[in-house]
């Protein structure tokens, strides 16, 4: 999940680390032709448009639709959910992104999309007077900013605000979004720690109900808060879940469900066919699906949020579930209540206890940890190694993070239309 300079410091998340040694996909000479478009009264001359196929039209979801994800791990990677992005605009790509229920908005490693003549590790190349670049259905603005990830291990991505359609999935089924804001990053600062490395990691596919933000240096927040990211944005702006930019038909509710994923095989996601697809993501919900879940209403807008009530056509809601009771029994015992985030982007369980809590500072492996949501749903697991590794931040008084371990045995849903979260 994202922790930015504008988010509540109590909101804690998973480790997010990336190397910039990505392999740039081979692109035909035709696809490499570029159109530089002058905008906003700029004086630069525009070159001839690139001859390319138009972006794929947005997919309409009329029934709950299963899309493959690629859960995996390796000797150098913690267990991670991966969604394959197969095109950005009309540019064919093969970009494994972390499917992240703990953050909102999409970040894309620019060097895997654009030719070296357009972007380097220092940034995008704009001709004199140019304020935007149009490339095969992708718009890159000259708004430079950052997105920040992590807590103990922190990274800061540097890039530009852009706009494009995204196609994700694989040969078994794909979904194309409407045109949406994306963050096209070209470099990453590693403030501390280590973690996922490119070319395995190419960015984040954030699907949380909340807001994310692209921070622009020198921005002054208006009284009513920053706005949603648009082609007119010149300062810090908000992005939201990629799943909110899907065309949902009248027969379904906007949102998604994740099915249990017990297997995170060791494989190489960069080698085609090496990692097995798993049909764990269902796009679009209906009453039959939701009726079997224990649900709670989301807090909309998030506590402390100042900005548009709706972005992308749906309410901006808090990803933290308030008043979750967490208890340990067995070798370690104790109970506390806090906010909790169910986060596919965290490879362990992070328990942030209140100041003065009687909850133990360490959960001994073999102890049972249980969580009870306000809806009465209870989830339990046995603390141990791997995704069951349980880290206690004694007295941190922030949100607890319920990571990948939950998703190995249980279902999870987010309904953007009704602003509901569900478990079973």
Positions of predicted regions on the chain:
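Sec-dependent signal peptide recognition
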Residues: 23-29
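C-terminal motif of bacterial Sec signal peptides marking the signal peptidase cleavage site
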Residues: 35-38
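Pepsin/retropepsin-fold aspartyl endopeptidases
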Residues: 40-424
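N-terminal secretory signal peptides that target proteins for export/translocation
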Residues: 1-20
């Amino acid at each position: 999940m994202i922790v930015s300079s504008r988010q509540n410091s109590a909101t804690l998340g998973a480790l997010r680390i990336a190397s910039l040694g990505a392999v740039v996909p081979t692109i035909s000479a035709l696809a490499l032709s570029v159109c530089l478009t002058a905008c906003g009264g700029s004086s630069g001359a525009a070159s001839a448009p690139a001859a390319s196929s138009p972006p794929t039209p947005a997919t309409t979801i009329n029934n709950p639709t299963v899309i493959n994800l690629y859960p995996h791990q390796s000797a150098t990677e913690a267990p991670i959910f991966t969604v394959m992005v197969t095109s950005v605009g009309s540019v064919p790509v093969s970009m494994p992104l972390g499917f992240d229920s703990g953050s909102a908005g999409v970040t894309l490693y620019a060097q895997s999309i654009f030719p070296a003549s357009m972007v380097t590790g220092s940034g995008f190349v704009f001709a004199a007077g140019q304020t935007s670049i149009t490339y095969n259905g992708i718009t890159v603005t000259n708004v430079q900013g950052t997105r920040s990830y992590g807590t103990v291990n922190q990274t800061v991505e540097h890039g530009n605000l852009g706009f494009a359609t995204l196609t994700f999935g694989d040969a078994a089924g794909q979904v194309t979004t409407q045109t949406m804001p994306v963050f096209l990053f070209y470099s990453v600062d590693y403030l501390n720690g280590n973690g996922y490395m490119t070319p395995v990691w190419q960015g984040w596919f954030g699907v949380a109900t909340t807001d994310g933000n692209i921070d622009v240096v020198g921005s002054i927040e208006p009284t009513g808060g920053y706005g949603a990211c648009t082609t007119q944005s010149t300062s810090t702006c908000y992005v939201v879940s990629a799943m909110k930019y899907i065309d949902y038909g009248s027969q379904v509710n906007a949102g998604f469900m994740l099915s249990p994923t017990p297997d995170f095989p060791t494989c190489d996601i960069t080698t085609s066919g090496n990692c097995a697809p798993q049909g764990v993501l269902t796009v679009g919900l209906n009453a039959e699906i939701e009726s079997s879940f224990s649900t709670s209403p989301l807090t909309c807008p998030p506590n402390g949020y100042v900005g548009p009530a709706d972005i992308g056509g749906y309410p901006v809601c808090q990803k933290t579930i308030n008043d979750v009771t967490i208890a340990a029994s067995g070798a370690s015992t104790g109970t506390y209540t806090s906010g909790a985030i169910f986060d596919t982007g965290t490879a362990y369980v992070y328990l942030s206890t209140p100041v003065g809590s009687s909850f133990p500072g360490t959960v001994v492996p073999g102890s049972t940890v249980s969580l009870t949501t306000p809806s009465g749903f209870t989830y339990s697991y046995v603390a141990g190694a791997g995704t069951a590794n349980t880290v206690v931040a004694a007295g941190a008084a922030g949100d607890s993070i319920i990571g990948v371990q939950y998703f190995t045995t249980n279902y999870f849903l987010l309904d953007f239309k009704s602003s509901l979260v569900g478990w079973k």
